């Protein structure tokens, strides 16, 4: 069983912002596998389904980004999911737009949502899909809560689809295979 968590902020004002990349990827997976994310529990919205023979829980925390760990730990404990089977999808400023990076473990890298998840799980050993949003020319908060330009959006739509495939690959083939397949790929217009 896998817990697939997309990080983001709830509310219409945050829809399609850079910081809501995780929510967007989870929505793509939900659509592909006909999973309704309409149940409220674990301080978030979730739905259950299958990727092949593997049961998955899709979770969108409603705690706001910086407290995402509260939601993740509640769902993980309820379903008794191993940390190695918790996949977290989120935006990453250290990666260029058009790229993603799959990792099996690692530090928060300055991302407060991941930092909070690491604190609550008491471990940094969980897979993640880091989606590049590029470096800001402006205030970081304004940047991550801002929307992509039209040109960037074209690239991001393709990266979101690729990120969903990377998550599915982790479930079906394992982290190493997903890393080999998706790390280093760059989407351009």
Swiss-Prot record:
One of its GO terms (cellular component) is cytoplasm. The record marks 91 as: Stabilizes the basic form of H active site to accept a proton. It comes from the Bacteria. It catalyses: an N-acyl-L-alpha-aminoacyl-tRNA + H2O = an N-acyl-L-amino acid + a tRNA + H(+). The active site is at 19 (proton acceptor). GO terms for biological process: protein quality control for misfolded or incompletely synthesized proteins; rescue of stalled ribosome. The record marks 9 as: Discriminates between blocked and unblocked aminoacyl-tRNA. It is found in: Cytoplasm. Its EC number is 3.1.1.29. The keyword tRNA-binding applies. Pfam families: Pept_tRNA_hydro. Its main location: cytoplasm. Belongs to the PTH family. This is Peptidyl-tRNA hydrolase.
């Amino acid at each position: 069983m896998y817990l697939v968590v997309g990080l983001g902020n709830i509310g219409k004002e945050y829809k399609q912002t850079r910081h809501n990349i995780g929510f967007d990827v989870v929505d793509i997976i939900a659509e592909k596998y006909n999973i309704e994310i309409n149940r409220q529990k674990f301080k978030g919205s979730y739905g259950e389904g299958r990727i092949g023979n593997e049961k998955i829980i899709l979770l969108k925390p409603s705690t706001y980004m910086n407290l995402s760990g509260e939601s993740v730990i509640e769902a993980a404990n309820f379903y008794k999911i191993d940390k190695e089977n918790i996949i977290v999808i989120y935006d990453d400023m250290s990666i260029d737009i058009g790229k993603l990076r799959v990792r099996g473990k690692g530090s928060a890298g300055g991302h407060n949502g991941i930092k909070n998840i690491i604190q609550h799980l008491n471990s940094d050993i969980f897979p993640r899909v880091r989606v590049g949003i590029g470096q800001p020319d402006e205030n970081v908060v304004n940047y991550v809560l801002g929307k992509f330009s039209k040109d960037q959006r074209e690239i991001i739509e393709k990266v979101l689809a690729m990120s969903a495939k990377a998550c599915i690959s982790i479930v079906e083939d394992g982290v190493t295979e997903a890393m080999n397949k998706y790390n280093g790929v760059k989407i351009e217009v």
